[in-house]
Amino acid sequence: MQMPSGLMACMLFIIWAATISNVYASEQLLGGRAFTAPGVTIPMGADWEAQGITHKTESPVDLAVALDQQLYPALVPLIKTFAQKHGVKIAVQNGTCGISAGLLSGKAADMGGFCCAPALTDRLPGLKFHTIGIGALALITNTTNPLHNIDVGDARALFGNDIRDWSELPMSGFKVGTHKPVRAIARLHCKVRPGHWRLILDSEQDFGWDITEVSAIKDMVKQVSLTPGAVGYETLWHIDRLKHEEGSQVKILSVNGAAPRDDHALAQGRYPLYRVFNITTWADGAAHTKLGDALADYLIARAADIKPEFAIVPATTLRQNGWMFEDNELIAEPD
């Protein structure tokens, strides 16, 4: 008697979860994981693996691509150039990491784009990750804050509620006897994925009980711009974009003496907070396309041509500075 494919997939998932639980638990103890192991994939069952890609676009296309909200404006000009050069139609959807993950798991996209390193649950059978580059995650305060530089340990204390008043922070610039309560703003997106805000504190439970949590990028920047004593975080492109579009002005801090706008410090690993920008392709089987491979190769090769306003340090520069890769995927910081 043949076991139903759904039951088989469920059993495979249980076995898979058991095999990685010890490794995952030990990583959790370290806190602030930047990456997951590239050799582990989540089981989806034979029926799923045999499926090809079914596009859900309004009209027929050669490739369907879903990108997160920072890769979308950064890569669309390159994708358009590629499509014109090859005489093909490529549909590009502007979304989030979650939307990309959903379309990939539903076999509805030839390529996905993420602003985070993959979670274990993103590692689908046959799916390959290719790193475009990384972008600094800047710590931001209200413009009235006299602080210019912060140690990453002190930053963790601010978000973790271990430092409750800016006057408690050494070299904060606040005069003796002056009190300014810390108002930590957090956007806890992509909780299952490593890196990004989890390089500050590894889980939402590590953040202080009195943080103000926001769901949208614009709310993060706006709240910090309007709230004396506030501290938050965001990528440089979103900070600059919202200053132009909505007038939200914030102060950007250096961390451990390195400025987030210093691409050399980021590439050398001296600036410690960043997002990883990845795209995906299907390696084999019915979902694989040579055109998808060609597009990925083109985007990686042209990553250095992405406009500077997007503040992405390309993978080629990371390789030159000792970051570790498996094939095209960034998997570890430099030693």
PLM region spans:
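N-terminal secretory signal peptides that target proteins for export/translocation
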Residues: 1-4
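Bacterial N-terminal signal peptides
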Residues: 8-19
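Flexible loop/hinge segments at secondary-structure junctions
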Residues: 24-335
